[in-house]
From Swiss-Prot:
Keyword Repeat (UniProt): yes
Official protein name in the record: Dynein axonemal assembly factor 1 homolog
Signal peptide: none
GO molecular function, one term: dynein complex binding
Biological source species: Drosophila yakuba
LRRCT domain residues: 185-223
Gene responsible for this protein: dtr
Matches recorded under InterPro entries: Cilia_flagella_integrity, Leu-rich_rpt, Leu-rich_rpt_4, LRR_dom_sf
Biological process annotations from GO: axoneme assembly; chemical synaptic transmission; cilium assembly
């Protein structure tokens, strides 16, 4: 199918120009496409990108949360910068070539398996790529990221990446700054994940959920060098730096505050948290030196203490305060945190050396020999303070003294040892010429005078020093040239170069005065790192070698020995000050030296015999020799170099002029240029300690191993000279292997170890992904195929429907010739069958048939239509739309056959009179159902969270918390008080017990039910009566409230007892309830029409049994007929015709209906029985047993009554005896009945309790005997009734007299109901031709469906006659028993209640025998009654009445206004107000007719005295 069709089926939205403009309007954008730079198209259901050609100026396009499967349609969007395509169905990155300016691309939550087509050649400025939640899984899917040179933000979270080789890809992304990998398996598989990625990505500033701080990177680099110990140390350095920053900021604030306060009120500055006392400074400094492998403080002293007289004096005071409160380790950490230009490189020293040499050379050229001698001495003195500090694993300090002669050398060596340099750091004393030279005391200042007086050596000294000056100047230049190329020359010239630099540094150091020595290392370090240091400035202005002694410029150039002496004294004073400071720093060196020795032995393999000396100075020298890897070689080279220099001096010093000396020095310096370059490289390596520590390069990696970025941060030096030939000489470090190399080996080993596993897992995952993708493709294809077929079906149906409409409109005549189309009749939904107006009529057809007589259901219509489509398309086509082609005519005929069988049976069963009575019954049924529901709910109101109250005669819910009134919730279908014909649960069928048993399917014909119930009743009743009598012997005092409920008017009693409006389950009980109601309707119809002698042959009996047993399966197949069913229908039709004949004779025997009040019979003060009027008789038509309510004068228990109802779990008939104020039902407690005249208690008989089998037999689903027995049973019942009357006369003293109550009612209401029912029948008849063929209609017209009005009149006459007979008999019994009989007749309306008038009176409802000829009972039943009467005379009548009523309940009374006879006891009769009573004497004549209804068998005269209000 084409793409367009598929879009229509899936319901996705097309991206049209009109729709785009509407979206622009909605988002308040421009209607002119080219004016918009942003377009919001998200959450629109688009499947493809199209029609964007006019939006040429778009810079931002939002397309997330659509159904886009391909990137396309962007050819004109050349200015697009941001494209958002997350939450779509994209599988490949493509078609982005036109968007050359694309900066941000979001492809999250798609189906992408490989990153491609986004390289710099396609998207040259792509900066951000978000591709989270896709199907990326290995390094191959990410390999194209290497081509994204400008990509700086990459989000790969929540993919399936598990390949650790992706680190190699990230290493090649030089601009990657933000990386998100969380949610991938590789995060847990990559060892030291965060450190590894920080080291791999040099520019990374953000990793996953947090930034990459400089501290993180420094710690990662330290971990790479020295492992976890190095990381810990680096972390501690950063912590100290942070603390020092905080402390310095606080101290700065304190100093500013103190500047405005008098001295006595100033606050002290904060001390270091590491040292609370100045006495701990030495210890802290040594710990720092041991940790960091350096002595930075000495380096700072040497390199920084050169302040000018102008600037140094102004800052000394504040700097002293700072220095006093800061420990040396904090100063070091401060340098760590401020990584700028490398302070440690000896740039200033080199420049100072060159400046001093230039000054010396200039002085040599401009002054006479005596002045030269003085300058040389000064230069020699200045060389005494040269100190070289180098940071290695073993810290070392080389303090080398190079005097002009032996005495000078000895004095300087003594000075070095007295100043205590060796107490802080390793001090190497380089022995020159004479190793056995004695050490002289520092105090002997006279030695300096001897140096001056020895003029015979000055010329040679000058020659040597002038040559050295040129050598050092050339060495400094070479040093700067060799620093960047990171290469070594040979190790042969280290001694001479170090000696020269030490002389220079020492000269500058001892020139400092006392005030300048106290300045902090920070300030002076910054000053010395400046490109234009104070030394050079001072030299330019004053042309002085020593800038701190500008005031002595003139005197120095003078040949006066006094100035020279003063200068030497000042130098000695400065040395003393430095010695004192160094001793202060190194007070606690002994313990630290032991630690230093131990750490040194671990790094450099040493022989223990080298540190065997016990002398302090000798131990220190030996320790320095062990710690310094260059020391032995330096010593030897130093000696060689010095020897060579002295030989040159001796050979050139004698007899040369100043000019010749300059020429000689210049020539020889040219010859030694190459060697000096080697010295410069050695010196560069010797001074590399500070940069290594500051930048974390490590103690085992020298400057030539530095990373490029660290090299770029060093001081800018001059041109680079490459000497690759000599590189290998010092390539390797002294130690065996660095931690960096070890880490590399470990990484390589791990990579090799995991390579195979990675490859295998990658292959497995790749196969699984391919399989999943293949399955996805198959499923997608199948979906499209299904939608394609459905589309074709819809199109075909649509076209056919159009053709049908045209054909039905224009060619209506053709319908009769060929059944191409069918008349559907009115199409109604399943909920529209019932009438909505009164009166209510029973349904013509059971719901199982979907009421085809009134209109087909939608399902039937659709089936018919499908068949029509089949015949229209191709009559010969065997299959169309998956259905077998059938003609609609066949289905119509099948429906007609159904109507002929069961539907017509029900029509015959219901006459107009029965329908009219049913209307009245349903009205009363509704009233009683509502009353019973409300009363039971009210009685159980305590069970609910909210209470139920009666408000204005309406049951309302009272909220417990707020007290608000609310209507009751709508009841479920089981409790619905609507009179819909679909709702027939008022007469449900239940079995005894707990109500959990549900009956099977509905019987097909009501006659089967009735016959079966009679057969089972015959077998069980005798046993039941005996069981009841035996139980009464032991439970005479028990009372069971059997006050009649309306005839199955509502649900069974157990349901109402369990009713909880909050937990109504209408699905469980509604279906069986409806089925029971249908059964009841059939039974009722049969009782009205078929109560006479129906003799059926064997064939009919068999047919009924078969039909009944298969009714369950027929309900779901109402449209399918078979020959067996047709036979059944034919037999049933015959039975119906015969039934009509019996019905005509039956109506002749029926009595005239009268609406009578309740009749109560009493003997003395005891109420015998009470018969409810009207609805009681109506609703007893289908009762399986009657419930007799007897009075217990001893005990009344409402709970027992309820228990009885639950045990029977069957519909109870209620006598609705009400007053205007109160409603009585079986939940209302009955008070104890007392005979106020005699004071005696009346014996109460328990009602019979029927077993479950007996009750179930009333609704049995099968036939167990031939239906001919029914006739015999009915005849026996009639005979026993006559015998019963004669037996009562034989026992007059034990029989209770009856008081008859008779009231004639108007027939107006009955006639109105009858007219309404007939009107409905007329409507039904009018529509029958739509469904039935003419033949069937003609047959129906021949049948009689109702009786005439004349027949109704005869019925009324018969009823009156029957009542007369009963009254006459009752009067005779009354006269025979006692003269104390009080015959009281009270006429009440439906709501009157005798218990209100007579306080504690108890009454019981008893169903009246109003049709003796229609009430058969078994001989066994009546014989059992007579046997019990002999055994227990006091209980005989109640038992007999119970059995008779039980038998009577199996038959249906005439559906007209009924008669009620009630017996009762009236102990409070004498207490009633006579004003409200009226007594009349009534005489009646009764005629007993024969079975045919036309012969008078007997005439009786009845006299009664009636009292009423």
């Amino acid at each position: 199918m084409s793409l367009s069709n598929r879009k229509e089926i899936t319901g996705l939205t097309r991206m049209t120009p009109k729709g785009l403009k509407e979206l622009c309007k909605k988002d308040k954008l421009y209607q002119t496409p080219r004016l918009n730079d942003t377009l919001y198209l998200h959450y629109q259901g688009f499947q493809c990108i199209e029609h964007l050609e006019e939006y040429t100026e778009l810079k931002c396009l939002w397309l997330e949360c659509n159904a886009i499967s391909e990137i396309q349609g962007l050819e004109k969007l050349s200015k697009l910068k941001c494209l958002f395509l997350q939450n779509n169905l994209i599988t490949k990155i493509e078609n982005l070539e036109p968007c050359r300016e694309l900066d941000t691309l979001n492809l999250s939550s798609n189906h992408i398996r490989k990153i491609q087509n986004i390289g710099t050649n396609i998207l040259p400025v792509l900066n951000t790529l978000t591709i989270a939640s896709n199907y990326l899984k290995d390094s191959e899917s990410l390999s194209d990221l290497v081509q994204c040179k400008t990509l700086s933000v990459l989000d790969l979270s929540n993919n399936r990446i598990d390949d650790i080789l992706i680190v190699k890809i990230f290493e090649q992304m030089l601009n990657l700054k933000v990386l998100v990998l969380q949610g991938n398996p590789v995060v847990s598989r990559l060892p030291q994940y965060r450190k590894t990625l920080i080291l791999a990505c040099k520019e990374l500033t953000y990793l996953d959920s947090r930034p990459v701080f400089p501290r993180d990177r420094a710690c990662a680099e330290a971990w790479k060098r020295d492992g976890y110990e190095g990381e810990r140390k680096e972390n501690n350095r950063w912590n100290r730096a942070e603390r020092r920053k905080t402390r310095e900021s606080i101290n700065c604030t304190i100093r500013i505050r103190n500047s405005h306060r008098p001295p006595d009120q100033q606050d002290p500055l904060l001390r270091s948290s590491d040292s609370e006392d100045d006495t701990c400074t030495g210890t802290t400094l040594k710990k720092v030196a041991l940790e960091n492998g350096c002595v930075d403080d000495i380096w700072k002293e040497v390199s920084c203490e050169h302040p000018t007289s102008e600037s140094g004096a102004s800052t000394s005071s504040s700097v002293e305060d700072n220095d006093a409160t800061s420990s040396q380790d904090d100063l070091i950490a401060e340098k760590l945190s401020n990584r700028g230009t490398l302070e440690g490189r000896p740039k200033v020293l080199n420049e100072t050396e060159g400046s001093n040499l230039k000054r010396v050379n200039q002085n040599i050229k401009n002054v006479e020999p005596r002045n030269i001698q003085t300058i040389v001495f000064e230069e020699d003195v200045s060389k005494k303070s040269q100190v070289i500090i180098e940071e290695e694993n073993v810290p070392k300090i080389n303090l080398i003294n190079e005097p002009c002669d032996l005495n000078d050398k000895k004095s300087i060596i003594v000075k070095c040892k007295k100043t205590g340099y060796t107490s802080i750091g390793p001090v190497h004393k380089k022995t020159v010429f004479h190793e056995d030279a004695e050490i002289k005391k520092m105090e002997d200042v006279v030695l300096c005078q001897d140096f001056i007086k020895s003029e015979e050596h000055m010329s040679s000294d000058f020659a040597v020093n002038s040559k050295l000056g040129k050598d050092i100047e050339q060495t400094c230049t070479a040093q700067r040239n060799e620093a960047q190329c990171k290469e070594f020359d040979e190790d042969q010239k280290i001694i001479e170069i170090e000696s020269k630099l030490i002389h220079e540094m020492y000269e500058s150091f001892e020139a400092d005065d006392d005030d300048k020595l106290n300045e902090t290392f920070d300030l002076n370090l910054y000053e010395t790192t400046s490109e234009h240091h104070a030394h050079k400035v001072s030299f330019d202005e004053n042309k002085m070698p020593m800038s701190c002694y500008q005031e002595d410029k003139e005197s120095i150039l003078l040949p006066k020995s006094m100035e020279e002496t003063l200068f030497e004294e000042e130098c000695f004073i400065a040395n003393d000050k430095c010695a004192h400071d160094l001793e202060e720093i190194g007070r606690q060196m002994d313990e630290d030296l032991a630690e230093l020795r131990q750490s040194t032995q671990n790094v450099v393999g040493l022989s223990k015999d080298e540190i065997a000396e016990t002398d302090i100075e000798t131990d220190e020298e030996d320790l320095l020799a062990q710690q310094d890897p260059y020391s032995p070689l330096l010593k030897q080279q130093f000696k060689n170099r010095r020897m060579k220099i002295m030989l040159i001096e001796e050979s050139k010093a004698q007899g040369e002029s100043q000019r010749d000396l300059n020429i000689t020095v210049s020539n020889e310096s040219g010859g030694d240029d190459k060697q000096d370059q080697l010295f410069a490289r050695i010196l560069d390596d010797a001074t590399e300690n500070i940069p290594k520590r500051i930048f974390g390069t490590g103690c085992d990696a020298l400057s030539y191993n530095w990373p490029q970025e660290e090299c770029l941060l060093q001081l800018t030096l001059s041109e680079v000279k490459e000497t690759p030939a000599q590189e290998s000489t010092f390539k390797n470090s002294i130690t065996n292997s660095s931690s960096f190399e070890e880490a590399n080996k470990i990484c390589v080993h791990m990579d090799q170890k995991m390579a195979e596993e990675e490859e295998a897992l990658g292959k497995l995952l790749h196969d699984l992904e391919n399989e999943a993708e293949h399955v996805y493709e198959i499923n997608t294809k199948m979906t499209y195929e299904e939608t394609t077929s459905s589309k074709e079906v819809v199109s075909i149906c649509t076209s056919l429907l159009d053709d049908i409409i045209v054909e039905l409109t224009l060619n209506e005549i053709l319908c009769h010739e060929k059944p191409k189309s069918f008349k559907f009749g009115p199409i109604e939904s399943d909920e529209e069958f019932s009438y909505s107006l009164e009166p209510q009529l029973e349904k013509l057809v059971p719901p199982a048939l979907e009421d085809p007589a009134r209109g087909k259901s939608l399902r039937e219509c659709l089936d018919t239509f499908s068949d029509f489509v089949s015949s229209m398309a191709d009559p010969k086509l065997p299959l169309m739309l998956g259905r077998n082609p059938t003609l609609g005519v066949e289905k119509i005929r099948a429906a007609q056959e159904l109507l002929k069988s069961k539907n017509l049976a029900e029509i015959y069963a219901d006459s107009a009179e029965s329908l009219n009575s049913q209307v009245a019954k349903e009205i009363e049924k509704r009233k009683r159902r509502v009353a019973a529901t409300a009363t039971r709910c009210f009685n159980q109101r305590d069970k609910y969270d909210d209470t139920l109250e009666l408000v204005n005669n309406r049951l309302m819910i009272v909220k417990r918390d707020s007290g608000d009134l609310e209507e009751l919730p709508p009841p479920p279908p089981l409790i619905s008080d609507s009179e819909s014909e679909d709702y027939d649960t008022a007469d449900d069928e239940y079995t005894p017990g707990k109500g959990s048993h549900k009956l099977g399917s509905k019987p097909k014909d009501s006659k089967n039910l009735v016959t079966n119930s009679f057969l089972k009743e015959k077998q069980a009743d005798s046993d039941v009566v005996e069981e009841v009598v035996k139980k009464n012997d032991h439970a005479e005092d028990e009372f069971y409230s059997l006050e009649a409920m309306t005839t199955f008017s509502s649900l069974d009693a157990e349901f109402f007892q369990k009713l909880d409006l909050q937990k109504v389950n209408d699905s469980e009980d509604s279906e069986p309830a409806i089925n029971c109601m249908r059964n009841y309707n059939e039974l009722q119809a049969y009782m009205k029409s078929g109560s006479l002698n129906h003799r059926m042959n064997t064939e009919e009996t068999k047919t009924l049994q078969t039909s009944f047993s298969t009714v369950g399966s027929d309900e779901g197949k109402t449209k399918l007929r078979n020959p067996q069913e047709e036979k059944e229908n034919a037999l049933l039709k015959k039975m119906v015709l015969r039934m009509k004949e019996y019905e005509e004779r039956e109506h002749q025997l029926q009595l005239v209906p009268h609406e009578l009040g309740s009749v109560k019979l009493s003997l003395g003060g005891s109420k015998l029985f009470e018969q409810t009027p009207e609805t009681v008789l109506v609703h007893t038509e289908n009762e399986p047993t009657s419930k007799i309510k007897f009075i217990d004068n001893k005990k009344t228990n409402n709970d027992e009554s309820t228990h009885l109802i639950k045990n029977y779990c069957e519909p109870l008939v209620r006598a609705s005896c009400k007053t205007s104020n109160k409603s009585i039902d079986d939940d209302i407690q009955s008070d104890v009945s007392t005979d106020y005249e005699s004071g005696e208690e009346v014996v109460v008989v328990e009602p019979p309790k029927l077993s479950e089998a007996v009750l179930k037999s009333f609704y049995s689903d099968g036939f167990e005997a031939d239906l001919n027995m029914v006739h015999e049973l009915e005849e026996a019942t009639r005979r026993n009734l006559y015998c019963y009357h004669s037996n009562e006369m034989l026992n007059p003293t034990k029989n209770h007299p009856f008081s008859l109550k008779k009231t004639l009612s108007s027939k107006t209401s009955t006639n109105e109901v009858t007219v309404g029912a007939k009107a409905k029948w007329a409507k039904i008849a009018e529509r029958l031709h739509e469904f039935l063929d003419p033949e069937t209609i003609s047959k129906l017209n021949k049948e009689q469906f109702g009786e005439s009005d004349e027949f109704e009149d005869s019925q009324d006459a018969n009823i009156f006659t029957d009542i007369t007979f009963e009254e006459n008999n009752s009067k005779k019994y009354e006269n025979l028993v006692s003269e104390e009989c009080n015959c009281t007749k009270s006429i009440y309306d439906e709501n009157s209640c005798p218990s209100e008038l007579n306080g504690n009176d108890q009454f019981s409802g008893l169903k009246e025998i109003n049709k003796d000829k229609e009430m058969p009972t078994s001989n066994l039943e009546l014989n059992s009654v007579m046997i019990q009467s002999k055994k227990k005379t006091s209980e005989i009548l109640p038992n007999e009445i119970g059995n008779i009523i039980k038998a009577c309940s199996s038959f249906e009374a005439p559906p007209t206004d009924p008669i009620g006879i009630e017996h009762f006891e009236d102990p409070t009769l004498t207490q009633m107000n006579p004003e409200f009573l009226k007594t009349k004497q009534i005489e009646c004549n009764l005629q007993i007719l024969s079975e045919d209804g036309d012969v008078v068998v007997q005439e009786l005269s009845v006299n009664a005295q009636v009292s009423f209000e």
